[in-house]
Amino acid sequence: MDIRKESLKKHYEWNGKIEVVSRVPINSAEDLSLAYTPGVAEPCLEIQKDYDKSFELTRRNNLVAVVTDGTAVLGLGDIGPEAGMPVMEGKCALFKEFGDVDAFPICVRSKDVEEIVNAIYLISGSFGGINLEDIAAPRCFEIEKKLKEKCDIPIFHDDQHGTAVIVAAGLINSLKLVHKNLDEIKVVMNGAGAAGIAIAKHLLNMGVKDITLCDSKGIICKGDPRLNAVKQEMAEITNLSHLEGSLTDAMKGADVFLGISAAGCVSEEMVKSMAKDPILFAMANPTPEIMPDIAKKAGAAVVGTGRSDFPNQINNVLAFPGIFRGALDCRASDINEEMKVAASFAIASLVSDEELNADYILPEAFDKRIGKTVAEAVKKAAIESGVARI
């Protein structure tokens, strides 16, 4: 089957992947007067007295906006907000299927940070959370930061943090197989965009001490005048050995390679130069940084990719539905680092020691335990870290 052609055919048939369904019966004049006028005036007046009542008297408690400007859609790049709509609808369908979260696509016709921030802020009173999606770096960092400062509901850029949570979960289990610890490993990352930077920060928060970050020009190091502000910040907290040079140089002696970059940029020789039993997550799509068979031939102990046709798919769908479910259930004001760390360990825990092997480091996407397990861990972390409001 040609997936691309079949998907296009199905999208014409579906004419959209989501719809609004009424939660209340409206079959009589009495039903109408309760759900709408005149009865609806009473909940309106209650909310006027206390805006937080909107979480109890409306569906706001379960609503998430999936927002994009269409500038970094999948591997397609800057295709515009309307062209990004099929992805946003798909994301909303996944929210419902895997987390029972009601999500709506919001595609914004602007590339201006202040316009986007203002647009999202102005509608934030209708939602319990905001999921930012497919917004190009470095603008995505600024948008997320400004929204977190302005809004009192969770702001979560899934391309950054969802990816980071899954990578960490996969790494936790991979390290069990090779008998190494987070605080002992040397990690090399290729790709310093939204996902790469978020992964690096998340791993540092989880106890990894030695991370070297590379971009298309080579190793990111302090004092490099070409770096933008975000990369300068990363240079301060990574590459503590002050390495210089190329990705090839960085990978020598590394325990872990994480790629969020370009197809075919890692060779068999580069894998052979790594430490014993290296772990490689080659997540470039559709063609990974190195094909799994080549990596394993070169000595890789564990290989993950972003693809579903290889073992160990690094797939955000394991994370974002449960993360938002947990955040919404306790009306969290933020999705903080403690909650993301909890999500990583929760996902990793769903693969038992008996099941764990080099081709099975993460649970399957359709494992019914995932959403509930992640949600419970995230909710607990929110309560313990003080961002839960109920």
Segments and roles (model prediction):
Residues 1-155, 381, 385-389:
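N-terminal ligand-binding/catalytic initiation module
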Residues 74, 79-99, 157, 161, ...:
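Glycine-rich phosphate/diphosphate-binding loop of Rossmann-like nucleotide-binding domains
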Residues 232-301, 307-309:
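Rossmann-like adenosine-cofactor binding region
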